[in-house]
Amino acid sequence: MAMLGLVLSVLTTILALSEARIPGVYNGGGWETAHATFYGGSDASGTMGGACGYGNLYSQGYGVNTAALSTALFNNGFSCGACFELKCASDPKWCHSGSPSIFITATNFCPPNFAQPSDNGGWCNPPRPHFDLAMPMFLKIAEYRAGIVPVSFRRVPCRKRGGIRFTINGFRYFNLVLVTNVAGAGNIVRLGVKGTHTSWMTMSRNWGQNWQSNSVLVGQSLSFRVTSSDRRSSTSWNIAPANWKFGQTFMGKNFRV
């Protein structure tokens, strides 16, 4: 019986490790064309908050390397956290020489303006792919006076320091978890939570990268399982202790890049 117990323990450990494994590395995508404008002021203070729910982009680690995406790219919020490489293209009058690249994270939504034509003011109208860059990032690729420039862009792996962060907000019967600092594909499409006394439960996306559960999780240590848009998953076991409090942030395992 002792031997059987040892075998079962080993098998359980192997299964747990296999569930937590992160196979492969996100490779990004091919080059496409779009246009870019800017917003938020010279210090990017006007970019704080936003439709992804990240709040203070400085304290969350995104800084000024951010952009608001048009409807065609935003994907109803599922693109939040995705990373892009951009270059100013085909406009020698306004593009900086050498076509330097910038790398940004999607943190906001650029709403359409149907009162303006899509080629004159309604830059974020569907089906146009468009980036409204934080002003400091726009100035890295083009002159301020340009206002709007054509760009080439592609999805790239997100390179982040540290682990995935889970910030738990809400109250006893409403848990709202903000997920930030995701490496690899960057944007997540599924989030699961497991308490000490529960099975795995799928959380529903509330808005941006805020995910909700109406289960009572207070008093239990919590594990989270993140699935990114490239279908890789990362499981962070028992990262929130049983005495966790609303408003706290916990760090889990990130994706390899």
Curated annotation (Swiss-Prot):
Expansin-like CBD domain location: 173-252
Gene3D superfamilies: Expansin, cellulose-binding-like domain, RlpA-like domain
GO cellular component, one term: plant-type cell wall
Cystine residue pairs: C52-C80, C83-C158, C88-C95
SMART domains the record matches: DPBB_1
Endpoints of the signal sequence: 1-20
Keyword Cell wall biogenesis/degradation included in the entry's annotation: yes
Compartments it resides in: Secreted, Cell wall; Membrane
Domain Expansin-like EG45: 49-163
Source taxon at top rank: Eukaryota
Family: Belongs to the expansin family. Expansin A subfamily.
Protein name listed in UniProt: Expansin-A6
